[in-house]
A protein has these predicted regions:
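Flexible C-terminal active-site loop/helix
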Residues: 2-18, 30, 35, 305-373
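Conserved, mostly hydrophobic/aromatic
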Residues: 3, 38, 45, 74, ...
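Metal- or metallocofactor-binding catalytic centers and their adjacent structured scaffolds
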Residues: 41-123
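Hydrophobic faces of well-ordered beta-strands that scaffold small-molecule active sites
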Residues: 50, 140-146, 169-171, 197-201, ...
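Predominant activation on well-ordered alpha-helical scaffold segments within soluble catalytic domains
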Residues: 71-75, 109, 113, 117-118, ...
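Shared catalytic-loop signature of beta/alpha-barrel
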Residues: 215, 221, 232-247, 254-350
Length: 373
């Protein structure tokens, strides 16, 4: 039951659109979605897959850093390790690359974590959700991401999303003038009446701006505002909670369990956006979910424009914890082609938890070779 081999395959997946953040476009179409795929094999020939898909303008990791970290430091530390000792695997990885307020190179470590979970669940013949020990739901609803420069474009995206079956819309704000951000959210609300709509500031506002925006969104009937202020500004996060009736969800600030514990102690958090790759994989993501639920915090689901491996891992986790609001797993909106042998099961923008062992997906290794960098 030992890990025998770990291989890393840097790939580029073609994209059909790019996402704009307050710092600018997350990548270019030519750059594509660049991923370090991880194939983990045990002594009996069982295989698990993971992926590191960093967004260099969102996180501190890149494809190059993930590939080097895995090949040179993390993978060698795990060769010969017991596949059922996940905590021990993270302890070894944290010795090689130190953790702090976050797990330290969490996207790279998360790729190995997901591969390890996929492998051990395949050995057991159970889906990942069964390993997590809860089946609060068998599916999760997907949200349509709206990244638009004008209200007209935002309305068009929302109407198209409704026609495709989406009932939730996350609107990117924080990189326009305040009045334009209000117009963008209003346009989506009007174009998609009855849908669940929330703005995501991606840390783009000062405290004073965030308070004004929160009050404007309140008047429109919005109920949740995601990461309006910088993740390091604990004072602003706490102040905003008392200044607004909106639920303030923290995304970038939910980077690791030690920091979240400190935010809870300071009464500066009431909701967390869970990203599997952001926190170092399933092992830490499930701990963060348990911590949040025990502290009375609301959970929302999100991702990093995940390709199918990250998408599947997130669906298993979010369904296990019963996240019922639409989740921002937007990889399929942006990635034109992937490496799966057959598509992930999605019906009317609801992602269903696969019944097959592990992540429940099959990797087409001929496609991995075709997309290789």
């Amino acid at each position: 039951m030992k890990i025998e081999r770990i291989e890393v395959f840097p790939v580029r997946l073609p994209m059909k659109a790019v996402l704009t953040l307050p710092r600018g476009p997350s990548r270019t179409l030519d750059e594509g979605k660049r991923i370090a795929l991880v194939k983990m094999t045990d002594a009996e020939g069982n295989v698990g897959w993971g992926e590191a898909g960093p967004s260099r303008r969102w996180s501190a990791e890149t494809l190059e850093s993930c590939t080097t970290s895995i090949r040179e430091y993390l993978a060698p530390a795990l060769i010969g390790h017991d596949v059922f000792d996940i905590a021990g695997a993270h302890a070894k990885m944290n010795i090689e690359l130190a953790s702090g307020l976050d797990p330290g190179q969490p996207i790279a470590k998360g790729a190995l974590d997901v591969a390890l979970h996929d492998l051990l669940c395949k050995r057991l013949g159970i889906p990942l959700q069964a390993w997590l020990g809860a089946k609060r739901a068998g599916s999760v609803k997907l949200a349509r991401l709206v990244s638009a420069g004008t209200p007209e474009e935002a309305a068009r995206i929302a109407k198209q999303g409704l026609a495709e079956g989406f009932q939730g819309f996350k609107v990117k704000v924080g990189h326009h003038k305040e009045a334009r951000d209000v117009e963008l959210v209003r346009a989506v609300l009007e174009a998609a009446p009855g849908a669940y709509v929330w703005p995501d500031g991606n840390q783009g506002y000062t405290l004073e701006e965030a308070i004004r925006m929160a009050r404007a969104f309140e008047r429109m009937g919005v109920t949740l505002f995601e990461q309006p202020v910088p993740m390091t500004d604990v004072y602003a996060m706490k102040k905003l909670l008392s200044a607004s009736s909106l639920t303030i969800a923290l995304d970038e600030a939910a980077m690791g369990i030690p920091y979240v514990i400190e935010l809870i102690r300071r009464e500066a958090v009431e909701s967390l956006a869970i990203k599997v790759s952001k926190v170092g994989g399933i092992h830490y993501a499930r701990q963060m979910c348990d911590l949040a639920l025990n502290a009375g915090l609301k959970l929302i689901g999100s991702g990093l424009m995940d390709a199918p491996i990250g998408f599947a891992a997130s669906v298993h986790l979010f369904a296990a914890y019963g996240i019922d609001d639409p989740v921002d797993l937007n990889g399929p909106q942006f990635i034109a082609e992937d490496y799966l042998a057959k598509p992930f099961p999605v019906e009317r923008q609801t992602a269903c938890v696969p019944d097959a062992p592990g992540l429940g997906i099959q990797i087409d290794e001929s496609k991995v070779k075709r997309f290789a960098l």
